[in-house]
Amino acid sequence: MRWSRRRFLASTVFGTAVISGRSPVAFGSRTSHKLRQDELRIPITMCHGITDRLTRDRFEQYLDIARELEFTTINYDQLYLWLTGAGSLPDRPLMIDVDHPVASVASEMFPLMQRYGFTGNLFVNTGYFQDVCGGIPLEAGQSACATWDQIRELMTSGWTIGGHTHTHPNLSELSLTDPTGEQVRSEMDTNNALLEQHLGIRPEYFAFTGNSTGTTWSSVADLEAKLRYKLGRLWIIGSNCEIDGKIERYADFVNAPGPNEADGGPPFVSRYITRDTPLFRLPSMELERLLYAPEAFRQYLLGALG
């Protein structure tokens, strides 16, 4: 990934200072500087549905901020065309991702986002439906699993449905126990087959799994993902990730310059999708971590408008 000095400097000051000599307040209206398509920085958030911490009210605060700042949600088809130079995006694009098909995505988040004119993207680990989801418990305040009919309604309403393996294994650990990739291939192929069986689609986009460190990734999983999907997305909850059996600094993994930030996360420049972002190194920012405070979410969006 290549980062120009101008882009790096503009991105790394969004939290508290000014960008290009202007106060962040100036970005709240359409009269501010309009970025060219190749200058866009796309904020991308991720969550696991409504929980005791990420309540419906807190989630609606984020939607209020996004609407106030006049952001438009996009899906992965639009993103892929833009990244490959085959399409354009709205002036202020925003991505709202959800991992795991919990019921609250369909019963609470979906109708709320519809009221705001927003759509999202759901990455489905199909083992969730069979109660073999890598031992992942429901988070506090979460309901059970969404139904296939509910997920189909999301899809027909403009949501992207992506792949997220079958049983949600730690992909980094699999690099040690399954070096040939046999289990990784089975995870992806089972996931794809079930999504095709129940939804009639072959997913084109993939979200790498995560754990308490952040993204779990392996060279084998990356290779297999590239054989099956168009894009691959990571997950940021702090400054580290788990790569090929080892803990690694996220910024080093994605070749982003600069030290970690005061909030405990990677350099600000690594938190957005740009035209320079490799297709299988897309970031996503967990709403329950670095962006949890509404002001942190606001500053994240403002940082895209430099």
Predicted regions and their residues:
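Short, glycine/acidic-enriched loop or turn micro-motifs at the edges of active sites
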Residues: 102-103, 167
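A structural motif
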Residues: 150-174, 184, 195-198
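C-terminal active-site subregion of NodB/CE4 polysaccharide deacetylases
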Residues: 24-97, 104, 172-173, 178-185, ...
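Alpha-helix N-cap and loop-to-helix initiation/capping positions
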Residues: 138-142, 146, 178-183
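Short, well-structured secondary-structure segments
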Residues: 43-47, 54, 71-77, 95, ...
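N-terminal secretory signal peptides and thylakoid transit peptides that target proteins
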Residues: 1-16
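Acidic (Asp/Glu)-rich catalytic clusters
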Residues: 111-117, 144-162, 271-277
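Short, solvent-exposed loop/turn and secondary-structure capping segments
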Residues: 56, 106-110, 133
